[in-house]
Amino acid sequence: MTTQAAEVAKRRTFAIISHPDAGKTTITEKLLLMGQAIAVAGTVKSRKSDRHATSDWMEMEKQRGISITTSVMQFPYREHMINLLDTPGHEDFSEDTYRTLTAVDSALMVLDGGKGVEPRTIALMDVCRLRDTPIVSFINKLDRDIRDPIELLDEIEAVLKIKAAPITWPIGSYKDFKGVYHLAADRIFVYVPGHGHERIEVPVIQGLDSAEAREHLGDLYDGFVEQLELVKGACHEFDRDAFLEGEMTPVFFGTALGNFGVDQVLDCIVDWAPQPLSRAAHERVVEPTEEKFTGFVFKIQANMDPKHRDRIAFLRICSGRYEKGMKMRHVRIKKDLKIADALTFFSSEREMLEEAWAGDIIGLHNHGTIQIGDTFSEGEILGFTGIPHFAPELFRRVRLKDPLKSKQLRQGLQELAEEGATQVFFPERSNDIILGAVGVLQFDVVASRLKEEYKVECAYEAVNVWSARWIECDDKKKLEDFKVKAFENIAIDGGGHLTYLAPTRVNLSLMEERWPEVKFRATREHH
């Protein structure tokens, strides 16, 4: 095996997806603890806690105890290199979350055992389904009251349309939580409370029919054996091929807060999740083991370092190797760059990088020329596909408090839009500026960042827009007719693309009916 193939085989790049408060930040920290990337898990005990989660770094996140931006963390585990992409998990997140899922090879879904499948999880699973991303499931909070585990598995199957195969099964819950039983290995992992902040060797009992198992389970033993028979009869057996095709999810149980069950999840990602996969470009399919370097930008982050007004482009390497000082071609602007200062991430800790391989995420310093969806190569003209803009779900009109600052406002919004913090629309019929977002909090984030970073104060007003659609039409005359007739609702987005701002769902349906030659797109590829 070549060095290149060996390095690719070692990589696992995945994201964590969950509904707010399902325990995603806690499991992130415990995964880092497993990889010994942090010495002690600084758990976020409450939203007012002074100890901030390692992966929450922007000012607003510190105040609210939520991870707004997508952090990237790399750590070694069992002779593999793990790239973990943390995604915003609070009520209102952004397109960033959706786009992060285009840069990974698998995902870990965290569910609250007391609540089951929640709305945000459904939305994220829809995005995973676009690329048939393999999903590992972790049912969390076993140290509290949870719903019936069989019911939870049924819900995963019914709501998320994916087969659920339990790998471990919980023994009791809340005050009676004794641990989990590994079905295939016939082994009990014993839960020892009080070790949430450290790695311990989990006691293991081999064989459910052993005297030790009977003693540990006590009064729960007979009921558990009975339940297990039911589980084995009713549930799917794990099939790795079905998992790799995105049709089946292996399910684990545990408590992230108690640091229990997380190591089994990480072992599953190493043993079963795919190494970096091939990637489609407009021109051809790129294999990760190819020698030449290629990669695409899926996120831009401003201000990672309060000391510098910098912007970092997050790039997923698709093939080849990054070496410090190498020449790269920025395909969209047809420019060759010498990159000597790429970064690797550990949340807000940043280190200069000597080398990186397919599957890794690196940071490039960006002085305003790099945009989301940009491809970098060693000279080949390539454009990777599948990094879309998603139609916003919420809209606000921007009002400037100081009219003399309109230039700074436009510059700030342009930069924040390129970074994916918001989408900007300029209606043809007025001088208004309309912002679009996927969650309400994005508007707060934009306002506070305009104030902090661009010294611009703005307010928002309600606007009569239900949704946005990007317009395409092969017939130029029809397109011109459409623009005249629909003038009241036509806008240009921040990237210069023609957009229709529909005031209502009914209006959009009528327009689609009246103009069959015009395509109203809910997503737009980055070009």
Curated annotation (Swiss-Prot):
Instruction: Outline the extent of the tr-type G domain.
Output: 9-277
Q: Please state the span of the N-terminal signal peptide per the UniProt entry.
A: none
Subcellular localization, per the record? Cytoplasm
According to its UniProt entry, the protein's GO biological process terms are: regulation of translational termination
Q: Where along this sequence does the record place binding of GTP?
A: 18-25, 86-90, 140-143
Report keywords, A-Z. Cytoplasm, GTP-binding, Nucleotide-binding, Protein biosynthesis
Q: Which CDD domains match?
A: RF3, RF3_II, RF3_III
User: GO molecular-function annotation terms?
Assistant: GTP binding; GTPase activity; guanosine tetraphosphate binding; translation release factor activity, codon nonspecific; translation release factor activity, codon specific
Asked if the record carries the keyword S-adenosyl-L-methionine, the reply is: no
Any one Pfam family match given in the protein's UniProt record, by short name = RF3_C
GO cellular component entries: cytosol
Task performed by this protein: Increases the formation of ribosomal termination complexes and stimulates activities of RF-1 and RF-2. It binds guanine nucleotides and has strong preference for UGA stop codons. It may interact directly with the ribosome. The stimulation of RF-1 and RF-2 is significantly reduced by GTP and GDP, but not by GMP.
Please give the NCBIfam families that the UniProt record associates with this protein.
prfC, PRK00741.1, small_GTP
Family label: Belongs to the TRAFAC class translation factor GTPase superfamily. Classic translation factor GTPase family. PrfC subfamily.
Q: Supply the name of the protein.
A: Peptide chain release factor 3
Q: Which organism is it from?
A: Azotobacter vinelandii (strain DJ / ATCC BAA-1303)
